[in-house]
Amino acid sequence: MTKKILSIVALFIALLLSACTNNDEPKYGYLVLEWDSSLNLTSTQIIMPQESRTYGFKAENVKSVTWENVPEGWTVSMSEDNSSISVTAPAESSVSGITYTIIIVVEGLNGEIRKQELLFLFVNPKAIAYDDPKGIFVLNEGNMTTENGSLTYITPDGFVIDDAYKAVNGTELGNVCQDMAFDNGKIYIISQNGDENPVGTTFENDGMLVVLDAKTLKKEKSFSKSELSVLDWPTHIAVLDESHVYIRDNKGVYRFDVNTKELKFIEGSEGAPKSKFVVMNKKVYTIIDGYISKLLEITADEDIVNKKTLPYSAPYKEIYSIGKSDDGKIWLSAFGFGKYYIGKYSLEDNTIVSRQISIMPSSGASGVSFVTKGNDIYYASGTTIYTLKFDENPELGDESGLEAEAVLCDLNSLDSNAKELYNGLGINPATGMLYVNTIKGVGPFYTTNSIWEFNINGDWTTPQNKFDNYTNFPAGFFFANNN
């Protein structure tokens, strides 16, 4: 009797287990879905017009793959071997800075549904307001033998447009771009070689001087090397108006009228060095060295310089570069009698305050050896960034600057690829952020590079942002409404 009862119980358990197994086993097997492990599906992808992003995956027991929330003009497609999905932004659009979420829906044969969100930030170069003072321009020389110049733009939100000029116009800037200036809603960009380099290689580009709309970057005028054939390797530009565009070359300074194409040499500017102009009070300033250093002042009234001799008390034999101060004076970096200086010169009463620094500040071909925010001076030697809190107290001597100088950081210690700085620093007047360009080296190494952004009041061991491998021999930093 006991054996019979046990047999019945065993049979019941077997039937119960069988029933459970039959209920759990799907008719078609489980949905298997694995996205490419190299993809960061949780981050927002920056995408520009006509650009595509591809997402690889492996799947089994799939009934269908569909997509939802696709914006108008965007396309989503599956590869022929059903191993990836591509998302393409529209070629034309009137918007920029919009975030979109496209949902990929995968349904299994067993009815299971899995959804994957793909996040995109649509950045449209043709719909950006480039005259925002918080934006950052990086003008690139390009490789003299093989490529044209370009204009990198970093939006106030920190998104990089690799060549904004080309993205807007469909054409390229001249070979070896050197400098740019802002005036009355326009940007003026000068290149060293234009459409032909010194060995006779021709390039397809927009020439030696390009004038563009400061808000849209659309080209308005351009001038080829043949139209400006008098110029010998131009390096710097300053603008008072369309009839007074000043260009420095190996001879000196010329005035160019973009409407009449008149190009006239400024008498007395012979030997003006590679140094960025200062534009202040409707006048243009540059420098000239000699036994006694001088400022060259140029006005729209006449094509001749007014030479301003620095005080005899100034211990300078060579001026590296000049800059505009917030209180209408002129900053300068200089050398004399074995010492290096930062000075502040008053045009009104011809007085100068000097403070000694410990190193020769780097400038490269940009002619920018320092930048300022108020009375705080920033400069570099090698890959080391320095600052000087400039105290104008007349009771202090020149040597007081050595005590006020401080080392902020060595970029090479933060990134071993930062082997050298390329051209001068930049500081955005609207944000106070400081910018530095570094490269791994010349030759094949220049493509390994970084744009560094530092909060001058923050931690100098960690940049606020760092943008890698965007530049092509950067000529310098530029900011809208900062001529």
What do these predicted regions represent?
Residues 1-45, 110-136:
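Bacterial Sec-dependent N-terminal signal peptides
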Residues 24, 34-67:
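Solvent-exposed, low-complexity, repeat-rich "mucin-like" stalks and linkers
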Residues 42, 68-84:
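Low-complexity "stalk/linker" and mucin-like segments enriched in Ser/Thr/Pro/Ala/Gly
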Residues 142-146, 193-203, 252-253, 291-293, ...:
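Short glycine/acidic-enriched loop and turn motifs that connect beta-strands
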Residues 159-172, 218-228, 261-268, 304-313, ...:
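A short beta-strand motif characteristic of beta-propeller blades
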Residues 172-181, 229-238, 270-282, 314-325, ...:
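Repeated scaffold domains used in trafficking and secretory/extracellular systems
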Residues 256-384, 392, 396:
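Acidic, serine/threonine- and glycine-rich low-complexity intrinsically disordered segments
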Residues 446-483:
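Blade-level signature of beta-propeller repeat domains, shared across WD40, Kelch, NHL, RCC1
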